[in-house]
A protein has these predicted regions:
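Hydrophobic transmembrane alpha-helical segments in integral membrane proteins
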Residues: 1-16, 135-139
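N-terminal signal-anchor/start-transfer transmembrane helix
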Residues: 9-30
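Transmembrane alpha-helical segments of integral membrane proteins
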Residues: 21, 193-198, 219-223
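Cytoplasmic-side transmembrane-helix entry/capping segments in multi-pass membrane proteins
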Residues: 33-42, 66-69, 92-103
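Membrane-interface helix-loop-helix modules in multi-pass inner-membrane proteins
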Residues: 48-97, 201-214
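Hydrophobic alpha-helical segments and helix pairs
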Residues: 84-134
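Transmembrane alpha-helix/helix-exit interface in multi-pass inner-membrane proteins
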Residues: 134-159
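A mid-sequence, solvent-exposed acidic-amphipathic segment
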Residues: 155-199
């Protein structure tokens, strides 16, 4: 990983952090704020993140992806989902937390290039990986919402000062976001499993066809 690549990997992190900061500033003044500036900066981060990912995994034979690239892809899903949601729903500090998480995962892009890469020659496997990353991203959003919601609920029950938790959206919004992320995540995860089964079935069929062809060829040579 070159110094230039390292520097480029920090660009989406900087953009995501910038968007998160803009959200926090806006929410301090108005809890229902949906700052356009944060949406624009977050979307810029998503675009740069996508460009870096494409550069890292694109290869002449199709797609070559490392473990760190998979994690970065999950981060891209989190960042893209949050950037879109920012324009429609006041998620408060929840969106800031998710953007920071997306930025941290973006720094993993190409980190282990050449060391743990796996070639993905078949479109079925590419679709499976993409759907799995989408499901993982949405389920990560759900887990983040659960943790923050639990912390928020514990503070309310203990009647302690909310502190920075006051910047989170109302519990109803948190719960709705949680269930939407879980529902979408499991639907996409089911699709990922289906595409995985298709790929395995196709792989087995190809293996059997190759085995039969090899057996027939060896039989012909004996005759």
């Amino acid at each position: 990983m070159t110094i230039l690549h390292t520097a480029l990997a920090l660009v989406p992190l900087a953009l995501y952090l910038g968007a998160a900061t803009l959200v926090v500033r806006a929410v301090r003044a108005d809890p229902t704020a949906r700052p356009l500036s944060a949406v624009v900066v977050a979307q810029a981060g998503v675009l740069v993140h996508a460009a870096l990912l494409f550069r890292a995994i694109d290869s002449p034979g199709g797609v070559t992806i490392a473990i760190t690239d998979s994690a970065s892809l999950v981060g891209w899903v989190i960042g893209a989902t949050t950037a879109i949601a920012l324009g429609f729903t006041a998620l408060g500090a929840l969106s800031s937390v998710l953007l920071v998480l997306a930025g941290l995962l973006a720094t993993l892009t190409g980190l282990l290039g050449g060391l743990s890469e796996v070639d993905v020659p078949h479109w079925e496997l590419t679709a499976h990986i993409a759907l799995a990353a989408l499901a993982a991203g949405w389920l990560t959003i759900a887990v983040t919402a659960v943790l923050l919601l639990s912390w928020q609920d514990a503070r309310v029950r203990a009647r302690k000062p909310m502190g920075s938790l006051a910047l989170l959206p109302p519990m109803e919004t948190m719960e709705r976001t949680l269930f939407q992320a879980i529902g979408g995540g499991f639907v996409v995860l089911t699709l990922a499993l289906v595409t995985g089964l298709f790929f395995v079935h196709d792989l087995i069929a190809q293996h059997l066809a190759h085995k039969v062809a090899s057996h027939s060829q060896s039989g012909s040579e004996k005759v």
